[in-house]
Amino acid sequence: MGILIALIPAIAWGSIGLISGRMGGTARQQTLGMTMGALVFGLALWAVEQPTLTSKIWLIGIVSGLFWSIGQGQQFTSMKAVGISRTTPISTGMQLVANALAGVLLFNEWHGNMYWIGSASVIVLIAGAVLTSLTDKTDPNRSASENWGVGIRALILSTIGYAGYTIVVHYGNVNAQAVVMPQAVGMLLGALIWSFKDKPWVVKATYRNIVTGLVWGIGNLFMFMAMAQIGQAVAYSLSQMGIVISTFGSIYLLGEHKTKREMVYVVIGSILVIVGGVALSLMKA
């Protein structure tokens, strides 16, 4: 059941870049709008479930949300710099490394042969992520607007933010449903701090991205439910299989250009991501 639960974030999060791309706006507008949607989801969940919110849950939730605002804001920045189909695979690989290391080193989730199987699975996942991001240097239509300096810096910061967002909650060992609303408060605070000078709250695109936040909220809830059942390393790795949705979606729905050679890279890379994810799930099962 935990494995099935972990696939829900893959679908939800794999759609985030596509939805935000359709909703439009700058990285700051998208991040603020998304956090508004996440807060709406968090408040609705709290109203239905009425979980107890202790000071510990508030602290962990807000800190986790602040980390998330760094992760998501910088990922949107990278998407603007180098495109969704290039950002998502690289970001996925970096997040998988960070969360697998956290699961093993901080939470001692793998034992004995699990080290070898888990390590091999993560390597396969990372190889798939890298393949999907490779470019065809002979393509005369390569975008001159890609800014890899900005993109890589944003991805490094994004990975730190995303790693902190999951590690804090897992380390705190708090109820998944209870932490969602405080976490959304932290996300909104972080987004407001980052975007304040641009006043994104006066732009319609910000409010359109509330939809993005609602979809993210669904994935977030099921992500932490899965972590409690099958561990951080496996749950997070499975959740990142949404790379297939975001990569192919950005090509076919948003029209990001790919040559035949790049499409071969994408197909092989996506297969490797699926194989690595399945291997991790079988290891835990």
UniProtKB/Swiss-Prot annotation:
One Pfam assignment = Sugar_transport
Q: Source organism's superkingdom?
A: Bacteria
Q: Name one GO molecular function term.
A: carbohydrate transmembrane transporter activity
Arranged from A to Z, the UniProt key words for this protein are:
Cell membrane, Membrane, Sugar transport, Transmembrane, Transmembrane helix, Transport
This protein's membrane topology, according to the annotation, is:
Multi-pass membrane protein
What the entry lists under CDD domains is as follows:
GRP
Q: Where in the cell is it found?
A: Cell membrane
SUPFAM superfamilies, alphabetized? Multidrug resistance efflux transporter EmrE (SSF103481)
| Ranges annotated as spanning the membrane | 2-21, 31-48, 55-72, 112-134, 147-169, 179-196, 209-228, 233-255, 264-283
Could you give one GO CC term from the UniProt record?
plasma membrane
> Where does this protein chiefly localize?
membrane
State the similarity comment.
Belongs to the GRP transporter (TC 2.A.7.5) family.
Name listed for the protein in its UniProt record: Putative sugar uptake protein lp_2503
Gene source species: Lactiplantibacillus plantarum (strain ATCC BAA-793 / NCIMB 8826 / WCFS1) (Lactobacillus plantarum)
